Every structure is written in structure tokens, then in C-alpha cells.
Curated annotation (Swiss-Prot):
InterPro entries: P-loop_NTPase, Thymidine_kinase, Thymidine_kinase_CS. Zn(2+) binds at residues 150, 153, 188, 191. Its main location: cytoplasm. It catalyses: thymidine + ATP = dTMP + ADP + H(+). One of its GO terms (biological process) is thymidine metabolic process. This is Thymidine kinase. Belongs to the thymidine kinase family.
Length: 224
């Protein structure tokens, strides 16, 4: 049985941990779950079968933390495990790989006094919202947004740069590509590149005008 003051808020809440690759999301998820386990809070941890980087029943963080997990293909499988094991806390890693049904599952758990902590990428390699994450952030009581360090300049990195033969991946590549340092690097906004990103003509004209204005300023400065 969980210790009396193990949960500091009313039972039935959602906490989301998000950010780019290499930001420590899984490490933070494991840390939080283990912290509650020290107070005898019963937990279950799930991860998508899509993610093949870890062993079948283990989640590994890049900092060496490990925790047991249940690999599932569909979000609704969580219900069966919860009914069987009756946890007070559910953790879900790599939540971006599930379809939108995960939002209903998370909401249902929280509505029924089960606390939920999820971790996942908030943006795909294009820098755009990833899968169900925007909806999850919208229903969460708490959001922890982590950053990594840009591999180009050392600034705060909020994006995951996909690399193919050490070159930025084209916008039209498949959204999901399971990989690690061989395929991805953390980047800040200004060093994140996505070739062939669709852009509106008005935006093109605006950017062209900005560049022309900047070039004129530089030219004038050189004359002065």
C-alpha cells in the first residue's frame, strides 16, 4: 500500500514530459516513477512495440537508468493490464508513436483516479507537432518541456535533426524512422534544416523582402 503522503495532489492527474531527442525525457520519466515506487506506489510502465531500441521488457535511458516496461501495439491494451494489476500510477514512454486513441486512454485513466506520466517527442524531424502529443499537452495538468544541446552551436536545442548520409533529411521522408545518434542530432531552431519544406508564396515574398532590406543595410554600412 502506498504511503500516506506519497501523492502530493489529488489522485487522477496527467503529467507530460516532452522535448527533442537527447533531452533526457526517458531518464526523467524513470526518475519520477522510481521516486514514487520508493513510497510504495504501485506502477506500470508501457512503451510502444514500434520502438525496438530497448530490450523487450526494459526501457533504457541514455544516462543508464533502467526500468521494466510492457511493450504494446495498441493503446487500448493498457486497460487489460490496469484491470489485472490495479496500479496507482501508469507511465508511458515514447508516447508519440501511438495513434490518437492513446489520448482517450490517458484521459480515462486520470478520470478514474489513476495518475499518468507520459514522455515523448513533441516535434517530428520536420519540427512539426508529432502524433497525439499536442492533444496530450492540452489535457495534461503538468507539462515539463526539456531541451538538449545543439550539436552545431551549443545553444538550447528544441528540435531533432534527422540525418541521411550526414545531410538533413528531406521534408517528404517518412515521419517515423527509429534511430539514435547515427540518424539524429539535437539542433536549435536556427541550425535545424529541412530541405523542400512547403512554403506559401506570401511567405516567400516576405522572406525575400527581408533579405533585400538586410542586403541594403549591409551595403550602406560598407559605404559609411
Amino acid at each position: 500500500m502506498a504511503k500516506k503522503n506519497a501523492m502530493t495532489t489529488t489522485n487522477g492527474w496527467i503529467e507530460a514530459i516532452c522535448g527533442p531527442m537527447f533531452a533526457g525525457k526517458t531518464d526523467e520519466l524513470i526518475r519520477k516513477i522510481k521516486r514514487y515506487e520508493y513510497a510504495d506506489v504501485k506502477s506500470l510502465v508501457f512503451s510502444p512495440a514500434t520502438d525496438t531500441r530497448s530490450a523487450q521488457e526494459i526501457i533504457n535511458s541514455r544516462d543508464g537508468r533502467r526500468i521494466g516496461s510492457i511493450k504494446i501495439k495498441k493503446a487500448f491494451e493498457i486497460y487489460d493490464y490496469v484491470l489485472l494489476h490495479k496500479p496507482q500510477l501508469v507511465g508511458i514512454d515514447e508516447v508519440q508513436f501511438f495513434d490518437d486513441s492513446i489520448v482517450e486512454v490517458i484521459q480515462t485513466l486520470a478520470d478514474n483516479q489513476i495518475n499518468v506520466i507520459v514522455a515523448g517527442l513533441d516535434r517530428d524531424f520536420r519540427g512539426e507537432p508529432f502524433g497525439p502529443i499536442p492533444k496530450i499537452l492540452g489535457i495534461a495538468e503538468s507539462v515539463i518541456r526539456l531541451t538538449a544541446i545543439c550539436s552545431e552551436c551549443g545553444a538550447e536545442a528544441s528540435r531533432s535533426q534527422r540525418l541521411i548520409d550526414n545531410q538533413p533529411a528531406d521534408y517528404n521522408c517518412e515521419t517515423i524512422l527509429i534511430g539514435d545518434t547515427e540518424s539524429y542530432a539535437p539542433r536549435c531552431r536556427h541550425h535545424h534544416k529541412v530541405p523542400n519544406r512547403p512554403i506559401n508564396d506570401q511567405t516567400k515574398n516576405f522572406k525575400r523582402a527581408l533579405k533585400n532590406n538586410f542586403d541594403k543595410i549591409v551595403e550602406q554600412s560598407s559605404k559609411d
